[in-house]
């Protein structure tokens, strides 16, 4: 944004008013509104559009290929004959090997602001009063936006409103693109845009960099939310504008990545948790209503002997007919005959054949909660468990 002191803005506004007063007589003689002629030549076909106080008309005429050339801006002196239509403004803009030359014919009472850029760039024209600004490209609908208020041209080349000091339009060297939602109008309709009051001048066109499509193939966004859309109305007197917050249509959605599904093992870890799981005990008993499982095959074989009644391990001691399902049971039985007791109590020197018998005996040496002196001298009362299978 460019700012100027209030005194300079008032001085320039006074100069504009004096210039307009000098040409007021010429304006009274001219009854028709300024005619804006925009033509585009691409070598095949073109459109000639004119705006006046009557209904607009669209005429087709062939283009010529001789219009190719470098950008040129020419403004005739405002002192020529009024009947000729006023100062002539021609602006040939080459783009992609084609030439199109919008021409604006104005009355002498109108103010013309021109901005000449380098050859790769395009020229923009802004008129004071209820004038029209041509922005065109071959085979693309034109945009006509009226603007009211006093304008001035600072040294930097951007037209600035004299009331607020805000630049009216900025552009880059890239080719312009039409606003989203614009459409050509028939001969009985008028394309009308939002008017800007002179008391609050504002930017009427966003920058061309915001209007251009993105260069990145992945960035498919449309122009930002401040881009405006125009409504086509049947009446010439109606001026309707959509809210500035409306976003451009047809916003494509970025294809999001596919949701990654994490498959979790619903089965418990083998060897953890309960030991009776089928994974930890692969050897199962097939007898009816049994369902027991074991980690070793030998344990399953000894278990199945209970179902069959087989006792392969028999005692060879004289006059002993005991037999057992497992070999360890037979060895434990032989201690009855040999009186071998490997498990001895360290407090009372008693001996036992099995470790579980020793643990059961050691509980008698521990004082109880009710009678601490109980079971202190009951070592003689304790008798070893009966020998058996």
Swiss-Prot record:
Top-rank taxon: Eukaryota
Alphabetized InterPro entries for the sequence: Znf_C2H2_sf, Znf_C2H2_type
Record's keyword terms, sorted: Activator, DNA-binding, Metal-binding, Nucleus, Repeat, Repressor, Transcription, Transcription regulation, Zinc, Zinc-finger
Classification via Pfam families: zf-C2H2
Subcellular location: Nucleus
Start and end residues, zinc fingers (C2H2-type): 283-307, 313-337, 343-365
GO cellular component terms, A-Z: chromatin; nucleus
Similarity remark: Belongs to the Sp1 C2H2-type zinc-finger protein family.
Function recorded in the entry: Transcription repressor that binds to the promoter of target genes and prevents their expression. Acts as a negative regulator of epithelial-mesenchymal transition and metastasis in breast cancer. Specifically binds the 5'-CACCC-3' sequence in the promoter of ID1, a key metastasis regulator in breast cancer, and repress its expression. May be a germ cell-specific transcription factor that plays important roles in spermatid differentiation and oocyte development.
Protein name, UniProt field: Krueppel-like factor 17
Organism: Homo sapiens (Human)
